[in-house]
């Protein structure tokens, strides 16, 4: 029997990595992936554009996010282009401490609301140590995840539209809409009904900055009227329900404006808050004839949605 030398093993491993990288890249190239991660009572959303750019919206309450990411990312991938903290409460930010230790992160987008907790301070300090560029979200900011594909992938910030440093975390929660071709996802964070009404009432406010993680960072874009925003940037295929299905979010008026085919609720099994609340489920049931499909992480685990730019399909 021939001896297998260390050099041979190294070459085989390198070849194997190259093959799997090529397969993975080819599989990802044509689709947008949006995965609502099963991390218990909290929020964590993994987004991967067709060109491979990756964003995580909220990090969940603990290190479980690492396990869930391991199912979606190849083991050799140690970079994440951007993390977004919709609000600084523990159930949205704690997992980012582990992310920052394990992955190279380029950008951190945050709402600007304050939290003096130890975990929030730890995440902020890690971001500083790792040289992560921090940006405060404002309405009109456009984050271009993919400008190379036939259909651009862009995240548009709908809220906040002001300094929210003195607001409660939920009242300043980031709200965004993700668009790829003809498909959209509305991401609500923990935004309460008052923020939903504020978004619905946009009339004359101007939109502001644009940010492109694939290129040179923040840069200005043309301003558009709030009415144009209302008309064109609310309807979405998927509505990520605000605040884990709490009755303090998800008004009938807002659901009607978004007109989703899927409503996704991220909450933990038998959580102490009783999320999702019955009132929210009753509201969503009013739209079942459209039809509206309700998906819950506490029932289904991690929910993976794929878009080809024309339609979303559930992969899991």
Task: Please identify what each model-predicted range represents.
Residues 2-316:
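Non-globular, low-confidence helical/coil segments that flank catalytic cores
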